From Swiss-Prot:
Organism per entry: Campylobacter fetus subsp. fetus (strain 82-40)
Biological function: This protein binds to the 23S rRNA, and is important in its secondary structure. It is located near the subunit interface in the base of the L7/L12 stalk, and near the tRNA binding site of the peptidyltransferase center.
Listed name of the protein: Large ribosomal subunit protein uL6
Any one GO molecular function term: rRNA binding
Subunit-level organization: Part of the 50S ribosomal subunit.
Classification of source organism: Bacteria, Pseudomonadati, Campylobacterota, Epsilonproteobacteria, Campylobacterales
Source species, domain of life: Bacteria
HAMAP family noted in UniProt: Ribosomal_uL6_B
GO-annotated biological processes: cytoplasmic translation
Keywords: Ribonucleoprotein, Ribosomal protein, RNA-binding, rRNA-binding
Pfam families linked to this entry: Ribosomal_L6
Amino acid sequence: MSRIGKQPISIPNGLDVSLKGSVLVFKKGNNTKELDTKGNVNIEVKDGNIIFTSKGDDRQSRAYWGTYRALANNVVVGLTTGFTKQLEINGVGYKAAAKGKVLELALGFSHPINYELPEGIEISVEKNIITIKGSDKQVVGQVAAEVRGFRPPEPYKGKGVKYAEERIIRKAGKTSKK
């Protein structure tokens, strides 16, 4: 039995949720998101809650039950508060600058890296901290992973781009034989 799927999602004020067949439609202001469940779960929208129930008792149905509940909750949280990821740049001469919809990175290569931001993502840079904001959890995480992937932190000096909460396990350098 899905412990996540059993929990109803409360609909906050200002968020309109409607059900069109097997598609949940979330609206807040001029922002609209759709979640297609492909008919794998039963959905009810009543009394300010979204309630998910499993279509069957097989393993696949129970997996969909918890998954779609979590995806719907991510849409609700994204439209109300949004998601944020922070990246930290460490290294001599490593810099970042936000220029409109492009993130310009100088990470020790012979050329600057210009990363074009996807739709719905905002970015801000303060000193060596890059803050990525957006309403879609998957896209925010994907952008953060791609930016980190340009120069992942190395274990000897810790230089590179890392998540703000990430801890780098350091290695000792070579020791000389005498």
